[in-house]
Amino acid sequence: MSKAVGIDGGTTYSCVAHFANDRVEIIANDQGNRTTPSFVAFTDTERLSGDAAKNQAAMNPANTVFDAKRLIGRKFDDPEVQGDIKHFPFKVVDKSGKPQIQVEFKGETKVFTPEEISSMVLTKMKETAESFLGTTVKDAVITVPAYFNDSQRQATKDAGLIAGLNVMRIINEPTAAAIAYGLDKKSQGEQNVLIFDLGGGTFDVSLLSIEDGIFEVKATAGDTHLGGEDFDNRLVNHFINEFKRKNKKDICGNQRALRRLRTACERAKTTLSSSAQTSLEIDSLYEGIDFYTSITRARFEELCQDLFRSTLDPVEKVLKDAKLDKSQVNEIVLVGGSTRIPKVQKLVSDFFNGKEPNKSINPDEAVAYGAAVQAAILTGDTSSKTQDLLLLDVAPLSLGIETAGGVMTKLIPRNTTIPTKKSEIFSTYSDNQPGVLIQVYEGERARTKDNNLLGKFELSGIPPAPRGVPQIEVTFDIDANGILNVSAVEKGTGKSEKITITNDKGRLSQEEIERMVSEAEKYKEEDEKEAKRIAAKNGLESYAYSLKQTTSEKQFEEKVEASKREAFTKACDDTIAWLDENQTATAEEYDDKRKELEQAGNEVLKDLYAEGGVPGGAPGGFPGAGGAPSTEETQGPTVEEVD
């Protein structure tokens, strides 16, 4: 059985799955949830991720990081990044043109790249899988929005490396969802399936034809910056204005109030998918003022109507690109939590002349499900279900080079099936030109200045010749991850240069990745040390209380003389008082303190045992002692329930 997993690293929530014994298992985290918030938080003492990080967001807004996926692989001056920064409670700084996240961690100012934050979320998913599978997990297939560009894909791959994963493949989210939908549907002839994937932060539409286990993507389109969070933002702004109207106060400057309001808005949005109205009740939201209000589904739909409508543009685009009429679409599959919104479902259904979307797959889990199937295939774990499965994905954006006059000359048009390789011959622009600059762009516009520069390289040493004579063959090669290699050869001399488009400016260098990997390991060790410290503290605390309880038992008073009794009770009380004052002591200090208490206890408890055992005590042990081992012995649980 292979231990490869599929990870859907979402903008707001992530999910991990594993394929074994002919079925996919979605793996629940330590809280029992099948999806985990893509949150990382930094405090004075520790680093938190997942549910633990999200749950303390209101108390620690400046150091709780989320939405790394909206920053990954982008430039700092990207208008969308600038728009997001206005909403973020944490600080985003410009480091050589890239956005980085600045937080306070253990009393120091730290700066992290979006890749590092994403890697922490991926590490959390990796650990979730490891505790379920009972073994280390190295191999993973990670999904990205279909409309992610080259640098966003590379950055996602880097995040996986930093998390200590071997990223076997980067696959597109809608394609993964299509596998989840089509895995059990074998013999229905060719089906055109439209995947409508509206998640927490990104939106994709892909049109596939599925036939006999072959999943061929015909076209893809989307918006890497549209999702449930944008709907939350509309609600948050609506309620900020309402609060202003009612109380003449603006809560915009108070991050804690904004976080509490946002959490309430997320909840309200979810409720409005199943009821027509919901109320928000937030006690003491701002300056002691309670905020009680309500919102109807109709009002919510009106607040977001332009966003909802804009989801249909990519649908029209994929139909046009795939040269299909809407009547030729056999199934519409909804993926992503935001497709639970009734208005979104209705818009899609109306667009397809009343055709009902297919709801046979879980919108939150479908992407991880498909990624797990792909991971199993790549590790050679063939079962009857997967052996005939073939994925043919496409490049989402056209790729080309700049030619004279700033013209974009496309070598690979968008929606070309990948992996693919394409060569074209170019020449020099002026007489005796000694070299050419090859600039690689992605995008759909006619002029390169309107497209995205991926990278450039120089091919020099061309022998002097009139313009148009030298033959320079440029080859574009896209691998299965959608990542591009470009090479150029001067035919006369055989001189060649090549570049893996790793986004010169944007991509992390090998050294940086190695540094981040070792830092990630260091943080992990610190996290484990902190967990050990907490266990020692809790162990000492419950031990001290259980001994103290013994002192109040009747037998104790009867069998132990008063002076010993008082000394022992004082030792227990002193330990408890010491614990209150030393919340941040080391594991060793807690263990030493425990040994002192054990010695004091041994003296007194000998008298008790001599008289023939103690009720409630384990044979040969102190009452309650089995339940709170020190960190050196690991028998028994180290957790106690607090009412």
From Swiss-Prot:
Signal peptide: none annotated. It is found in: Cytoplasm. Keywords: Acetylation, ATP-binding, Chaperone, Cytoplasm, Nucleotide-binding, Stress response. One of its GO terms (cellular component) is cytoplasm. Its main location: cytoplasm. The modification N-acetylserine is found at S2. Residues 609-643 are annotated as: Disordered. Belongs to the heat shock protein 70 family. Acts as a chaperone. This is Heat shock protein 70 2. The gene is HSA2.
